[in-house]
Amino acid sequence: MPNRKEVLLSEYVLSCCSTVDLTREKIEAHGIKWVPFHYEIDGKEYLDDFGETIPYDDFYAAMAKGSATKTSQVNVGEFYEHFKAIASEGKDILHISFSSGLSGAYGSAEIAAKTIREEFPRAQRNCYRFAMRVVRIRPAHG
């Protein structure tokens, strides 16, 4: 029989954006669910898959050559689908978000989480609010 700590840890899923400072291998090894940011090179959009489709060095080389490059956040709908897939399994979500001082992703995640909490009342007791507070401990400019 698992001890109490193991049972508690199995009741939630860690979640993050592809902006997290971890490799895809580490994320997958620890069962962390992730949602990708977007980026463009010369008008062609890609999902951030940890540099597998286009290595990060190629993105930066394109910038250096003068290509039109930009990044964009995960939108509310993408966060909603990401969170819904986890909540549908009966799991709570501990999501670590990109800083609200650098991206609108935090706000999009909050909006999606609110909808998920309304649709999955059991999620009211989850760790999501705590995780969202964690990202505010260190200001983006500091």
Residue ranges and their predicted role:
Residues 21-22, 102-104:
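Short, active-site-adjacent cap segments at secondary-structure transitions
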Residues 8-10, 89:
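Residue-level preference for short coil/turn positions at secondary-structure junctions
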Residues 89, 94, 98, 104-142:
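Active-site histidine-anchored catalytic micro-motif
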Residues 10, 29-32, 120-125:
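A short helix-to-beta-strand connector/capping loop
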Residues 13-78:
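N-terminal glycine-rich anion-binding loop in soluble enzyme alpha/beta folds
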